[in-house]
Structures are given as C-alpha cells and as structure tokens.
C-alpha cells in the first residue's frame, strides 16, 4: 500500500517502492483489486524482498517501514537519509476478503496523508 500511496496520492512528490522482509511471492488479491480500482498499473507491482533495495545500488531520501512490530522484526536501512516507522497490523492476516480490502484501502489513504504531511514538514 505504501508504493501505491506514494505513487498516486502525493502528486509526484514521492516515488514509492515496496518490498518485504518475508515476501509472499505473490501480491495480495485485495491489493491487486485496489490497484485496479485506482487505475495503478498492476504490472508495476511485485512481491519483492527487501534485499533488492538494501545494497549500495539504491539510496533513498526516506525509508519508511510499515511492518507490524508486534509480529515481525522491521528491517534496518543504512542507505537512506531518513528512516521512519509507521506501524500497521498485517491486513494479509484478515480472512474475510471485503474486510481485508477495506483495511488495505484505509492503510493506503492513511499512508498518503502521512506522506503529504511529511512533504509539507520537509519544505
């Protein structure tokens, strides 16, 4: 949801990438549906490992983790000027599809709001 929010709700102020510490190997079906609804190219989405972005080939102004600290260890970024953590419970654990989709959509909008506030603070 972070990638979607950064790339669709911030008017180009941020470019979002997404990766997980334990990628599932596939995109959550509710997340795919949201991408479709907001007209985000599903081909740009992938279930990638954080290792892809944690080498010296990538450098970020902000690395924002959104993992559920109660259930998993959040990654540490050394190739970022700023590291932030916004904790969200993992919606993939929600069994009911409609409830999971609603939760993902809520997270999507919440991250977008936080990114826009962050941009205002940095300016």
PLM region spans:
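Short polar/charged helix/loop
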Residues: 1-123
């Amino acid at each position: 949801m972070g990638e979607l929010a950064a790339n669709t709700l911030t008017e180009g102020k941020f470019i979002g990438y997404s990766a997980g510490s334990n990628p599932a190997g596939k995109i959550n079906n509710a997340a795919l549906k949201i991408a479709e609804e907001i007209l985000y190219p599903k081909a740009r989405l992938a279930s990638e490992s954080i290792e892809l972005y944690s080498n010296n080939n990538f450098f970020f102004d902000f690395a924002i983790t959104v993992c559920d600290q109660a259930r998993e260890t959040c990654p540490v970024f050394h190739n970022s000027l700023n590291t932030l953590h916004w904790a969200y419970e993992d919606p993939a654990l929600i069994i009911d599809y409609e409830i999971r989709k609603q939760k993902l959509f809520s997270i999507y909008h919440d991250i977008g709001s936080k990114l826009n506030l962050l941009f205002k603070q940095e300016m």
